[in-house]
Regions:
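Conserved ABC ATPase signature
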Residues: 97-101, 105
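Conserved catalytic motifs of ABC-family nucleotide-binding domains
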Residues: 118
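The feature captures the beta-strand-to-loop junction immediately N-terminal to the Walker
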Residues: 17-19
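Conserved ABC ATPase "signature" region
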Residues: 78-95
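Conserved small/polar residues in nucleotide/adenosyl-binding loops
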Residues: 176-182
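H-loop/switch region of ABC-family ATPase nucleotide-binding domains
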Residues: 158-159
Length: 186
């Protein structure tokens, strides 16, 4: 990646958009300190970051309830879990088996899992992947609601401009590992 420069402030949604293979996920992983930059500097004013990856590998044959899934790799309590599920509109799924969830329900659970500890930066990598048209609209509305309610910055990674434009404050375009300047949307 070359030429990347953008900020994600509290209460702001910034979208990194570009075709497959243009380095969007790599950029996100550098911001999250999952990957190191070969050169240059990645800075963050917070360690309270959460990430919803583009793909998550789950053994769908394993009996796993939503409440148990929420606790994997994170020390959150039941109150945090129910509040996060309520924020994402799926509190009724608390004791449901994960393998029985629809694509949209599972995405909402993933987002709830990420926001349970109230991050200051939320990174969402292709959050509407595998969700139907109506579900996409609902998820983009949910993302805006989360930004407003938690006053957290959101970095939204996408390759689809359709609904992104209605919820984002800034758009940064990534193309063949070069990033164009951020576009401010008013």
């Amino acid at each position: 990646m070359r030429g990347i420069s953008f900020e994600v402030n509290n209460g702001q949604i910034v979208t990194l958009i570009g075709p497959n293979g243009s380095g969007k996920t790599t950029t996100a992983k550098m911001i999250l300190n999952i990957l190191n930059a070969d050169e240059g500097l990645v800075t963050s004013n917070t360690n309270k970051m959460a990430y919803v990856p583009q793909k998550i590998n789950i053994d769908w044959t394993m009996p796993l309830r939503v409440i148990d899934f929420m606790k994997i790799t994170s020390s959150i309590n039941n109150t945090q879990i129910t509040e996060a599920l309520a924020l994402t509109g799926v509190e009724k799924l608390l004791y449901d088996e994960v393998h029985n969830l629809s694509g949209g329900e599972f995405q909402r659970v993933l987002i709830a899992r990420a926001v349970a500890k109230k991050p200051e930066l939320l990174v969402l990598d292709e959050p509407v992947q595998g969700v139907d048209f109506n579900g996409e609209i609902a998820l983009y509305n949910l993302i805006k609601k989360i930004s407003d309610k938690l006053n957290c910055g959101i970095l939204l990674i996408s390759h689809d401009m359709h609904f992104v434009m209605s919820t984002t404050n800034h758009v940064t375009v990534s193309y063949t590992h070069l990033t164009l300047p951020t576009i401010l949307l008013v």
